[in-house]
Amino acid sequence: MIHKNWQELIKPTQLVVQPGTDPARKATVVAEPLERGFGLTLGNALRRVLMSSLQGAAITSVQIDGVLHEFSSVAGVREDVTDIVLNLKGVAIRMDAEGPKRVSISAKGPRVVTAGDISESAGIDVLNKDHVICHLDDGADLYIELTVNTGKGYVAADKNRPEDAPIGLMPIDAIYSPVKKVSYDVQPTREGQVLDYDKLTLKLETDGSLSPDDAVAYAARIIQDQLSIFVNFDEPESATRQDDEDDLEFNPLLLKKVDELELSVRSANCLKNDNIVYIGDLIQKTEAEMLRTPNFGRKSLNEIKEVLSGMGLHLGMDIVDWPPDNIEELAKKYEDNF
């Protein structure tokens, strides 16, 4: 059927996650190759979902002893209540269960009150414990009750006020999104001898409650789930192709040659000198074995680990009956799958 051209479109074969200065919060994710125009399409969709639709946790209301409203001050506290509330919005929280939950801060001056002073509670983890909330002078006595909840995106303060709210409870704006910054860039790339493809680069920063690569994975899953309703037909698999793949006892991707991975010249030469021809040869090597290869250093090791990770593979894997006797014939047979 001529309309089934999605089967012929090129799909990304590499997904590389490059950790930033703070690997738990910052990373660059690169996917290539993509059909021309798909970099912009997917980059924009992923960015919007990353910023708006991932689940997170945030403080939704504050109650300070002796305070009736946010336009007040607390004796012995240098910041007024408005500043305290603003600082509480910056507390990064990981929450393992559905909310709401109550936590508190109890402190006596003189001292600096930080997010690390928030009381411990099952299922709640404060990530930026050094984040400053306020400063107490000598003799100051501060007690704050906080409500923590889960949600997505941004929720205005008036939506966080419960119907039975006691006097003095101050609802605050909740920014649930664990992603703080995300941008994307699209550059041309090549596949074989063809230069007319896209390379999508996503740069993102989270609050630490979710790793950058997991954030991208969840965003992609949301998009996939939302689009599934538009597919109004079943896709019959080619019986011949399915039967052929069933005959293999391993992933056909292992038949791809390592010189097609677009590694650096040093890494590629090291693999060649070590007689590593196929991905199946490579993934059976351990990290220690690779580091014993002449001229092969930690930088090359990290490069190869990132490339394999993007393919769902890793070093040190065990493959039964590898290599197959007819490996060259099989590699040629499955080269269209790569």
UniProtKB/Swiss-Prot annotation:
GO terms for molecular function: DNA binding; DNA-directed RNA polymerase activity; protein dimerization activity. Signal peptide: none annotated. Its EC number is 2.7.7.6. Residues 250-338 are annotated as: Alpha C-terminal domain (alpha-CTD). Transmembrane segments: none annotated. It catalyses: RNA(n) + a ribonucleoside 5'-triphosphate = RNA(n+1) + diphosphate. Residues 1-234 are annotated as: Alpha N-terminal domain (alpha-NTD). SUPFAM superfamilies: C-terminal domain of RNA polymerase alpha subunit, Insert subdomain of RNA polymerase alpha subunit, RBP11-like subunits of RNA polymerase. Gene3D superfamilies: 5' to 3' exonuclease, C-terminal subdomain, DNA-directed RNA polymerase, insert domain, RNA polymerase, RBP11-like subunit. Keywords: DNA-directed RNA polymerase, Nucleotidyltransferase, Transcription, Transferase. GO terms for cellular component: cytoplasm; DNA-directed RNA polymerase complex. One of its GO terms (biological process) is DNA-templated transcription. Belongs to the RNA polymerase alpha chain family. The N-terminal domain is essential for RNAP assembly and basal transcription, whereas the C-terminal domain is involved in interaction with transcriptional regulators and with upstream promoter elements. Homodimer. The RNAP catalytic core consists of 2 alpha, 1 beta, 1 beta' and 1 omega subunit. When a sigma factor is associated with the core the holoenzyme is formed, which can initiate transcription. DNA-dependent RNA polymerase catalyzes the transcription of DNA into RNA using the four ribonucleoside triphosphates as substrates. This is DNA-directed RNA polymerase subunit alpha. It comes from Jannaschia sp. (strain CCS1). The gene is rpoA.
